A protein has these predicted regions:
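One-carbon transfer enzymes
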Residues: 1-250
């Protein structure tokens, strides 16, 4: 698995590896100096998805995401890679090659180069929080809200290719939005959706029986971090998010 360090990504990983134990976890930091890692902790009393309902209290979500971490069973190799170094670290690539990987599961912030993808027997799949091809790149859950189009919030599971979020689509899913949700509720629901559909996509790729839909790359846009400003972030308060969902559902 290749993951980032934001709590939602780590939350997905924590639950995923409790059932599907990977050979190794490559965790990218939030910054180029290796800062921003969610630290590995003891596996005792690990937090789990705490509710299957829609009306999840904000404080419960805060507890889940503020205290969640990646389990690291003793036989799972764990690498930490500073942001921007994934495709440049020759020692890391050597170790990946030696692990004889079947498939790469990606849920991280950095594009994975073809050299690493080719090291896995069946290539890789990416968990993209956004509905490709309309919303590719970064912050693609926030942009639909800023565009007042919450109907475009969802998850895309696609095969990895050399570009950013452009690979053939295996699965897409949308959350059942509720009018009393904050952005954190949306994030939580996407984590659960990902956990439900990634194993299906993984098994299909491994069995060679996957049905894919090629993306029409003439549609939509690829968004980059520099476009998402502090002004954008300040706009997405609970009242704004709830209002966008209410307008969509009415």
């Amino acid at each position: 698995m290749i993951i980032g360090s934001n709590p939602a990504t780590v939350g997905f990983t924590n639950n995923f590896i409790s059932k599907y134990q990977p050979i190794g976890i490559i965790q990218q930091s939030g910054g180029p100096e290796g800062d921003g890692f969610v630290e590995i902790k003891d596996i005792n009393s690990k937090p789990k998805f705490q509710s299957s309902g829609n009306n999840i209290a904000e404080d419960v979500l805060g507890e889940v995401y503020d205290n969640i971490y990646v389990d690291n069973p003793s036989d799972v190799i764990h690498f930490k890679v500073p942001k921007g170094r994934l495709n440049k670290d020759e020692e890391l690539k050597r170790q990946i090659k030696e692990m004889n990987v079947d498939i790469i599961i990606s849920h991280g912030p950095e594009r994975i180069g073809t050299e690493i993808i080719s090291m896995a027997k069946y290539g890789g799949i990416n968990i993209h929080w956004g509905l490709s091809p309309t919303y590719k790149g970064t912050h693609t859950v926030r942009w639909p809200l800023l565009h007042e189009k919450p109907e475009w919030i969802g998850v895309t599971i696609h095969k990895l290719d050399r570009n950013l979020d452009t690979g053939p689509i295996l699965y897409q899913a949308k959350p059942d939005l509720q009018t009393d949700w904050s952005y954190r509720h949306i994030e939580y629901s996407l984590t659960k959706l990902s956990y439900d559909i990634v194993p299906k996509a993984m098994e299909e790729v491994l069995s060679g029986k996957s049905d894919v839909v090629n993306q029409d790359l003439s549609e939509g846009k690829t968004y980059f971090s520099k476009e998402y400003t502090e002004e954008c972030e300040s706009k997405l308060n609970n009242e704004y998010v709830s209002k966008q969902i209410e307008n969509y559902l009415s």
